[in-house]
């Protein structure tokens, strides 16, 4: 019963799509009608500007943290309950019932979830993801790699139930990224050079 309650708490908080909130309140626009049509951080940032993308990301991180903290204090930090809460947020964010089950891809959500679950392993996974973003110049494959790696780590160190939950979340992300994955392997994927972007911001790009 604890696990079900945790899942439900996560799902309903996950339904809060800050991409929709930010763009509709401040820009009076619907992000699903622009760019990739995805109500998530990347699309908002790409179409409307980095400021709005960052604001969206902060909102998605906040709802994830809220769900995890609620479950943490209700069930005294039980890891299995936290796993279900995180999965619930991923499900709610990816398949919100009020938006015809069309949501975001869950990168920000999963990033905070894995750090909250095990901050050392989570940070290592994110650093690996960042390294892959830099060398691959791609934003699709790295989050899938770090989530798969974290799933394996969790399975080995915390048992098959925990590992399976994170693996399910990884499969959800793969489903949400399915078009981007095809584009990547067919050479149509968008290239993002993070180092060049940083250098431009610092005014040292030549």
Swiss-Prot record:
GO BP term (any one): phospholipid biosynthetic process
Subunit field text: Probably interacts with PlsX.
Membrane topology: Multi-pass membrane protein
Catalytic activity: an acyl phosphate + sn-glycerol 3-phosphate = a 1-acyl-sn-glycero-3-phosphate + phosphate
Keywords: Cell membrane, Lipid biosynthesis, Lipid metabolism, Membrane, Phospholipid biosynthesis, Phospholipid metabolism, Transferase, Transmembrane, Transmembrane helix
Membrane-spanning residues: 7-27, 54-74, 81-101, 114-134, 155-175
Pathway: Lipid metabolism; phospholipid metabolism
E.C. no: 2.3.1.275
Any one GO molecular function term: acyl-phosphate glycerol-3-phosphate acyltransferase activity
Protein name (database record): Glycerol-3-phosphate acyltransferase 1
Assigned protein family: Belongs to the PlsY family.
InterPro entries to which the protein is assigned, alphabetical: G3P_acylTferase_PlsY (IPR003811)
Cited function: Catalyzes the transfer of an acyl group from acyl-phosphate (acyl-PO(4)) to glycerol-3-phosphate (G3P) to form lysophosphatidic acid (LPA). This enzyme utilizes acyl-phosphate as fatty acyl donor, but not acyl-CoA or acyl-ACP.
GO cellular component: a single term: plasma membrane
Lineage of origin: Bacteria, Bacillati, Bacillota, Bacilli, Lactobacillales
Organism, as annotated: Lactobacillus johnsonii (strain CNCM I-12250 / La1 / NCC 533)
Enzyme class: transferase
Localization per Swiss-Prot or TrEMBL: Cell membrane
Gene: plsY1
């Amino acid at each position: 019963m604890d696990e079900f309650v945790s899942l439900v708490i996560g799902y309903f908080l996950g339904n809060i799509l800050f991409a929709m909130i930010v763009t509709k309140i401040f820009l009076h626009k619907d992000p699903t009608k622009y760019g990739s049509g995805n109500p998530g951080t990347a699309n908002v940032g790409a179409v409307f500007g980095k400021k709005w993308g960052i604001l969206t990301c902060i909102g998605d991180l906040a709802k994830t943290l809220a769900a995890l903290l609620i479950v943490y204090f209700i069930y005294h930090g039980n890891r299995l309950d936290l796993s279900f809460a995180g999965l619930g947020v991923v499900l709610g964010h990816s398949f919100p019932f009020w938006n015809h089950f069309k949501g975001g891809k869950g990168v920000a959500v999963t990033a905070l979830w894995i750090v909250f679950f095990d901050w050392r392993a989570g940070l290592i996974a994110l650093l690996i993801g960042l390294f892959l973003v830099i060398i691959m110049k791609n934003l699709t494959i790295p989050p899938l790699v770090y989530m798969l790696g974290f799933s394996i780590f969790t399975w080995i160190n915390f048992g098959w139930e925990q590992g399976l939950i994170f693996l399910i979340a990884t499969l959800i992300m793969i489903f949400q990224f399915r078009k981007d994955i095809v584009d990547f392997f067919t050479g149509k994927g968008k290239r993002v050079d993070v180092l060049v972007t940083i250098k431009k911001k610092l005014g040292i790009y030549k």
